[in-house]
Every structure is written in structure tokens, then in C-alpha cells.
Design a protein with these regions (language model features):
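Glycine-rich phosphate/ribose-binding loops and adjacent secondary-structure elements
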Residues: 2-3, 213-403
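Ordered alpha/beta subdomains of enzyme catalytic regions
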Residues: 1-241, 359-403
Length: 403
């Protein structure tokens, strides 16, 4: 490797990989998934040298194991069970499950295929590797880091001056961070700020940094959870994906770990399944696409229609936020519901250069295509347009006929 090792701990992933991973381990061990990388930036190109470095970094990641100290940390999290910790004691990433080539318009193609239990753990470290390799090799990294520090100092100053009202907010920037160094710098700096009354820094999705700085590791479920539990079983009608996902989650966690993601197959379809039982059991819902104000008003109206006081529930916003957008959302919703924010790239990769818009998504489960139909065009990723059409027709039929 030409660069220092980027991923140095198996805790260096997002918290929801463990919350989903435990449920996969207990309920879906036979499921197999395929994951596909995509760079959405049109003007980005990965050189052959970058691709080779990415391969070597992924190989280094695959040599890691959980330490006993890390396992003890996980075991002390309320909802993590000893059986899952014992599995993690034996678990290791498998480089054999990766295919990394230059066969893509951006110059980088990555696929991972294997059990869902394994491959779910690859997404976040791989994206962090790709991002850091790109910015270290395409730019003068020292210049970028100076820009990052300057902007971070300004954020800290404005936080201290009570410029923003961020309610309960967390850092969600691991997958698109400038570097491990930059993310750690940002999390540490924000954690040390004496925030005013309307802002509370809760923690980070990066479990490694949460452990290091004694912060709360934050995260529940991702789109893959709804896609695979709902669409990975060929006997399921995919328009009911949310029901299967919520049902399995509640069986695993009861009232714990309860922020539901709404936009995997549109929020309107989600609400058909998010009825009194689930709306009561889950502590809140997460917004990740579409107009956040329309979404929040829709969720509040839904809670009211069920006789649930929305002020007892959390609206967690996590779509392309910065501190100004979060403040505006807080001001609008603060008297209507609990409000929380997950803020990623703005904290972990804010420089003078455009951040990468990269994803690694589940494209198959158990040999069957899976897809996300979010609340805004352009966020979906499926290799088979016929399946997307089928899924849309299933959703449309349900919305028209399942009253």
C-alpha cells in the first residue's frame, strides 16, 4: 500500500450495521446478497493506481479481527446479545467475496457477494476506503486538511456563539469522510464544545469513535433492511416490505432501538404498515429523501390520526443536512414533535472541493433483484429496470386497493 492503512478496527463502521447484523444473525442467516458500488459524480475518475490502492486497502481490512476489548464494549450495549458477540469473536471479512475492477464509467467497479451476514459489514469500510484513497491521491491532501480545519474551526465558533439550534444531533459522516484523521478531529472538536441549551451533541454513527470518545453510538436500520426482509423472500409481495421489516425488528428488539426508516418503497406505502402497534412501539421515524417539511407534517398527521401524541415521538432528519438546514427544521418542528438530526458530509468532509457522492447498495437478495423506490427520483439503484417496474406496479396496486 502507498497510503497508511485506512480501516484499523472492525468497529470502524456505522452502528446500524450491528443492529441489523444481530437480527440477520438470529433470523436471516441463510440470506445471500450482492452489493454494487456506484459513483454518482459525473466528472470523477478513479485512476488505475487508485484502484490498485483500493484493492490493497480492502485486503488489509479483511485481515482485521475484533479484539476482546472491542467485543466487551459491544457486549455492554443494552440491546446487543451475547450470542451475537460470540459470533463476532469468530467473524472476519473475506476478500474472496469482492470483485474490484476498472470496468465502470468512473474507472472503479466494486461488487461483493456472499451471505447477507457477511456482506452487510463491507459497505461502510469500503466506502470510507474509496473516499480517502480518492482524496489523498487526486489532490494535495495537506491542502485539503487545512481547508477542512479552517471550516471546522468556523463551525465550532458558530456553535459556541449560539448561531444554530440543532436539538439532539449526531455525526453520520463515516462513509463519505475526507479521512479517518479528519472525522476524528471533527467528532472530538464538536464533543468538546460547550453547546447552548437548544443543541445537544448525542454521538456518532462511527462505533470506533464513539468508544474512543465515550459518546453514544447512533443508528438503527438502513434501506437494505427493508429491501432484503421484504423483497428477498420470493413468496412476499414486495409492496408489504415495510411490514416484514418492522415485524422482524420488533421480534428482535421489542421497544428498544426503535427509529424506523420510512422511504424504502415510499413513505406513503410505509404508513400503510406503520399502524397503531408499530407506531407505538417505535420511538420515532427517520427522513432520508424528499421534502423534509412535507414529510414531517405527514408523519405528525399520521401520529395524530392514530391517537398518538407526536410530541412523544422523534422525527430524525438525515438527508443532506448542514447546520443551517437543521436549524430551520428545528424551528419549524420543535413545538410539534421531538426533533433530531444525523449530519454527515457537512461535518466529516467539508473542504473547498466537491465531496464524492458514492454509494454501495444491495442489488440482489437470494438471487432476486431488490430495489429502493424513495421519495425522490435518483436515489434508487437496481440493475433490472423490469423489476423496478414490477415493484412500482405492486406499490401502486396496493395503494389503490388495500384500504
Amino acid at each position: 500500500m502507498k497510503l497508511p492503512q485506512i480501516i484499523n478496527s472492525l468497529l470502524e463502521t456505522d452502528m446500524y450495521k450491528f443492529s441489523m447484523g444481530q437480527t440477520i444473525f438470529h433470523r436471516f442467516t441463510s440470506y445471500k446478497t450482492t452489493w454494487t458500488f456506484k459513483c454518482r459524480n459525473k466528472d470523477v475518475h478513479f485512476t488505475d493506481e487508485m484502484v490498485e490502492e483500493i484493492k490493497e486497502q480492502v485486503q488489509a481490512f479483511c485481515q482485521l479481527r475484533f479484539t476482546e476489548e472491542e467485543l466487551e464494549y459491544l457486549d455492554n450495549i443494552t440491546w446487543i446479545k451475547g450470542t451475537y458477540v460470540d459470533f463476532l469473536r469468530l467473524w472476519q471479512p473475506r476478500y474472496e467475496e469482492f470483485t474490484i475492477t476498472t470496468d465502470a464509467p468512473c474507472g472503479l467497479a466494486i461488487d461483493a457477494a456472499g451471505t447477507w451476514l457477511n456482506t452487510t459489514m463491507y459497505e461502510i469500510p469500503v466506502l470510507a476506503i474509496v473516499n480517502e484513497v480518492y482524496f489523498r491521491m487526486a489532490y494535495d491532501y495537506d491542502v485539503l486538511l487545512k481547508q477542512f480545519k479552517r471550516r471546522l474551526d468556523e463551525k465550532v465558533r458558530l456553535l459556541e456563539e449560539d448561531t444554530y439550534r440543532l436539538s439532539d444531533f449526531s455525526e453520520f459522516g463515516l462513509r463519505r469522510r475526507l479521512s479517518a484523521e479528519a472525522q476524528e478531529m471533527a467528532v472530538k472538536a464538536i464533543a468538546e464544545v460547550e453547546l447552548p441549551a437548544d443543541s445537544h451533541f448525542i454521538g456518532t454513527s462511527n462505533v470506533y469513535l464513539a468508544k474512543k470518545f465515550n459518546l453514544k453510538p447512533v443508528g438503527t436500520m438502513a434501506h437494505e433492511w427493508i429491501m432484503c426482509t421484504g423483497q428477498g423472500n420470493h413468496k412476499h409481495n414486495p409492496a408489504y416490505s415495510n411490514w416484514y421489516a418492522l415485524d422482524a425488528w420488533v421480534k428482535e428488539y421489542g421497544i428498544l432501538n426503535g427509529i424506523a426508516l420510512t422511504d424504502t418503497i415510499t413513505t406513503d406505502c410505509f404508513l400503510r404498515d406503520f399502524q397503531l402497534t408499530y407506531a407505538t412501539l417505535f420511538s420515532g421515524v427517520r427522513h432520508d429523501s424528499g421534502d423534509p417539511y412535507e414529510w414531517g407534517d405527514k408523519m405528525i398527521a399520521h401520529y395524530n390520526s392514530l391517537g398518538i401524541n407526536p410530541r412523544t415521538k422523534t422525527l430524525l432528519f438525515s438527508d443532506s443536512l448542514d447546520f443551517e438546514r437543521a436549524t430551520a427544521l428545528y424551528d419549524y418542528f420543535k413545538d410539534k414533535a421531538k426533533v433530531a438530526f444525523g449530519i454527515g458530509t457537512f461535518i466529516s468532509n467539508d473542504t473547498d472541493e466537491e465531496a464524492l457522492n458514492i454509494v454501495m447498495k444491495t442489488t440482489k437478495c437470494n438471487g432476486m433483484d431488490v430495489a429502493k423506490i424513495s421519495d425522490v427520483a435518483g436515489k434508487g439503484m437496481c440493475k433490472n429496470p423490469d423489476y423496478v417496474d414490477y415493484l412500482n406496479r405492486c406499490i401502486d396496486y396496493r395503494m389503490k386497493n388495500d384500504k
